[in-house]
């Protein structure tokens, strides 16, 4: 304490999980007598009992510090859940404690909910006076009520503001500040996604990875889903549900209530895999042919398990459970994945096979009839995903069925989000979504929720949604983001920790990393800002791509930055097994977005993709590049008819997060030419804009600067103090124990160079140099980590 307090009583509540944390063997209390910590005299009742407060009394003392010492019990850890110290009545008056909450963003003309708090000791009066004020900022701030801690504020002008909350108890005062970034509304209308329709890949980087997913990983997932001995459950649950619907006895469900999920994801992956042109590759063609037969078999079985009103969830059907009775049963989550698989199936068929698509509409319509404002049922999901799927369905049916066909699905998505309140941080139901400004809780749920919010914000233009989404983006990217693009420290249950708490034994669940890609892509569609695709690229090339090994024979649920754990074939919760391939095989969707008269080139991959409905025509785009190993890219533009539109080419900024600083700085373009003639385009929001009339055969060539960069973390990230990481373009690099001592020191003066190694890890650009002790170092791309055993780390000591 800053001032001496008087006390004669304290309580302690021990943490005991009957596992790794147990009650202590013994404990002692000490206090600071002015020169040393001494035993607390006459303490009585100091207990070691679980599930209660252990109260201790003693003769009154005056001190500035108390110390609690305890001895561990065997090999178990020991901890305290809560420790209370009681004022005996003679302590001095302490200033109030004031908190203003987290920094946030506001999209005009929206408002921000200020959730300040004030704690006081009740001296000299029961409650202090409080006041909100503007400390700085370019415009006027209007508070709904400046005299209460929780209120709202609006801003007359865009810019950066600092708001102050002050509490005064009559003798002393204290204050706290919150930073608010106020921005203008995003441009309207938002951009549109590019569906993954038939495409080619020539990239020497991407083609073998996509091939291995199709030839190795997806067949493995199919085998697991079809094996009746796999305890997690699979396609057999749909057969059992169909038996129950047909009135046949003995139907039995296998696995968790959410066991339909990985079957839907695997079906979706198979459908998207059909979009890749095998280009004469017999292995790809054979795998695709086999998967087409599986698709037909699975679709028939899934449709047989759909109830007459459109509802589908096999365990509920088999066991007769009541719908919408337990938000933790993943009803919405699985429905969302069914819808997304159905859309992929419809796209795969070129719109010629409507069975799954019609089933998805029946399922969504079932939810629309039952869930919503009174007199319908109030409801929100325990695991978000359906919100994204409903908006995706809405956008798709607007194309297939006409304008207005998707309105009910957007309304339902917004209702599910708006209903989140009075719950827990774990599933982001602790506050209304429009008042959530910090990324908290389970990371997959969070990123799916935030992506769904971004979708709803795009479709409705709701500024409170936009403000919350921008605030959450800042929290994720600038406070809780791993240098690999991974999300979720795992300090809470598979989720986010405190700001700047980013230990390297991180969780970074593969599903959460895929959610981050969805989130950033939606923000790019909202703001047309290249920084979101800089982040998407970072996550794609590192956190997601490293989720499977090079041969796509094994995968990993988590992606720590310091680990010796090998990937594996399956998991007790195989939620990621289909998410990874459906994400990576959707490469065209991450590569391009479009506007009415514009195409955005967001990623660089040797490929041929057709973008439809731009300036009234379709445009075939063929990229030729060896990126990320080489920065040269050639793009051939082939519109079906000559049209005027803007081609927006992302100019990467490797400085993606305020948490990390890269040196040397490497940004911009080295060159840009149209049809062989050098041009200097306008660069706006991270895009080089080429607005002209395009005809078939036009070419654009550009070169991106690529070089080795050192990365240093913000000093508030304790785990990385005195450490350095390396990157090359979008790739973060790892040091592996099979090549060197991963506890060696990489001096700041060490010379580093990139070198191509065609025979290592399928062909990679390594970083070479020497450690401070003169021994050679070798760093490999993060995505290729742990393919040779041993330990693999991102951050090395630099002193």
Model-based region annotation:
Residues 110-120:
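A short beta-strand segment in extracellular, disulfide-stabilized domains
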Residues 209-249, 293-311, 358-374, 411-429, ...:
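Long, well-ordered core segments of solenoidal/helical folds
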Residues 469, 534-542, 547-639, 659-674, ...:
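C-terminal beta-rich recognition modules with glycine/proline-rich loops and embedded aromatic residues
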Residues 1-92, 380:
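Aromatic, loop-rich ligand-recognition surfaces of beta-strand-rich domains
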Residues 93-97:
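Proline-centered linker/hinge motifs at extracellular inter-domain junctions
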Residues 186-289, 322-350, 384-408, 436-474, ...:
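Aromatic (Trp/Tyr) and acidic
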Residues 133-148, 680-681:
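Low-complexity "stalk/linker" and mucin-like segments enriched in Ser/Thr/Pro/Ala/Gly
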Residues 124-131:
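Solvent-exposed loop segments of extracellular immunoglobulin-like
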């Amino acid at each position: 304490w800053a001032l001496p307090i008087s006390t004669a009583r304290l309580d302690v509540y021990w943490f005991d999980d009957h596992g790794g944390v147990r009650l202590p063997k013994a404990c002692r209390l000490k206090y600071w007598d002015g020169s040393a910590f001494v035993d607390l005299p006459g303490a009585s009742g100091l207990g070691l009992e679980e599930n209660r407060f252990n109260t201790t009394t003693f003769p009154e003392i005056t001190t500035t510090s108390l110390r609690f010492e305890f001895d561990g019990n065997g090999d178990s850890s020991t901890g305290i859940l809560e420790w209370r110290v009681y004022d005996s009545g003679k302590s001095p008056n302490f200033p109030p404690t004031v908190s203003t909450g987290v920094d946030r963003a506001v999209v005009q003309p929206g408002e921000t909910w200020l959730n300040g708090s004030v704690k006081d000791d009740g001296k000299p009066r029961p409650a202090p006076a409080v006041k909100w004020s503007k400390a700085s900022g370019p415009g006027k701030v209007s508070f709904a009520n400046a005299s209460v801690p929780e209120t709202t504020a609006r801003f007359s002008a865009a810019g950066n503001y600092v708001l102050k909350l002050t509490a005064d108890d009559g003798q002393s005062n204290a204050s706290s500040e919150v930073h608010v970034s106020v921005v203008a509304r995003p441009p309207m209308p938002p951009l549109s996604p590019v569906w993954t329709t038939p495409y080619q890949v020539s990239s020497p980087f991407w083609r073998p990875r996509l091939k291995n997913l199709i030839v190795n990983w997806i067949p493995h997932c199919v085998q697991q889903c079809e094996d009746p001995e796999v305890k997690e459950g699979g396609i057999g649950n749909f057969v059992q549900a169909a038996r129950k619907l047909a009135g046949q006895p003995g139907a039995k469900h296998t696995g968790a209530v959410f066991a339909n999920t990985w079957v839907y994801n695997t079906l979706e992956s198979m459908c998207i895999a059909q979009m890749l042109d095998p280009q004469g590759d017999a292995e790809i063609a054979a795998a695709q042919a086999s998967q087409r037969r599986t698709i037909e078999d699975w679709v028939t079985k899934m449709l047989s398990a759909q109830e007459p009103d459109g509802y589908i969830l096999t365990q509920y059907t088999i066991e007769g459970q009541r719908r919408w009775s337990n938000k933790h049963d993943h009803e919405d989550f699985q429905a969302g994945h069914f819808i997304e698989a159905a859309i992929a199936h419809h796209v795969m068929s070129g719109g010629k096979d409507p069975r799954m698509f019609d089933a998805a509409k029946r399922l969504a319509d079932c939810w629309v009839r039952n869930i919503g404002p009174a007199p319908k049922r109030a409801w929100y999901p325990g695991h978000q995903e359906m919100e994204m799927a409903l908006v995706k369905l809405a956008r798709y049916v607007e194309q297939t069925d006409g304008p207005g066909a998707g309105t009910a699905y957007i309304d339902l998505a917004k209702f599910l989000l708006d209903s989140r309140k009075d719950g827990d941080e774990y599933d982001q139901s602790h506050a209304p979504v429009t008042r959530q400004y910090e990324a908290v809780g389970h990371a997959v749920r969070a990123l799916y929720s935030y992506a769904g919010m971004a979708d709803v914000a795009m479709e409705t233009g709701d500024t409170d949604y936009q403000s919350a989404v921008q605030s959450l983006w800042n929290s994720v990217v600038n406070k809780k983001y791993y240098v690999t693009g991974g999300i979720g420290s795992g300090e809470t249950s598979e989720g986010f920790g405190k700001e700047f708490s980013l230990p390297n034994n991180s969780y970074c669940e593969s599903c959460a990393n895929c959610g981050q890609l969805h989130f950033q892509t939606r923000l790019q569609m909202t703001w047309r800002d290249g920084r979101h695709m800089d982040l998407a690229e970072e996550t794609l090339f590192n956190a997601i791509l490293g989720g499977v090994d090079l041969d796509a024979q094994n995968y990993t649920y988590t992606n720590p930055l310091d680990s010796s754990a090998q990937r594996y074939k399956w998991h007790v919760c195989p939620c990621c097994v289909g998410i990874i391939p459906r994400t990576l095989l959707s490469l065209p969707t991450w590569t391009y977005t479009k506007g009415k008269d514009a195409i955005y080139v967001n990623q660089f991959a040797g490929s041929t993709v057709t973008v439809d409905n731009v300036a009234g025509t379709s445009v075939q785009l063929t990229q030729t590049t060896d990126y990320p190993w080489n920065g040269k890219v050639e793009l051939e533009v082939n519109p079906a008819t000559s049209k005027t539109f803007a081609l927006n080419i992302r100019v990467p900024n490797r400085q993606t997060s305020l948490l990390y600083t890269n040196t040397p700085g490497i940004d911009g373009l080295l060159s840009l030419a149209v049809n062989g003639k050098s041009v200097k385009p306008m660069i706006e929001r991270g895009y080089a804009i080429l607005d002209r009339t395009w005809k078939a055969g036009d070419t654009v060539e550009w070169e991106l600067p690529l070089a080795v960069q050192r990365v240093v973390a913000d000093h508030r990230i304790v785990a990385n103090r005195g450490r350095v990481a390396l990157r090359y373009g979008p790739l973060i690099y790892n040091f592996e124990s099979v090549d060197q001592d991963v506890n060696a020191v990489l001096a700041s003066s060490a010379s580093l160079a990139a070198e191509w190694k065609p025979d290592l890890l399928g062909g990679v650009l390594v970083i070479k140099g020497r450690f401070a002790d003169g021994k050679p170092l070798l760093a490999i791309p993060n995505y290729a980590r742990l393919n040779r055993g041993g330990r693999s780390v991102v951050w090395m000591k630099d002193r």
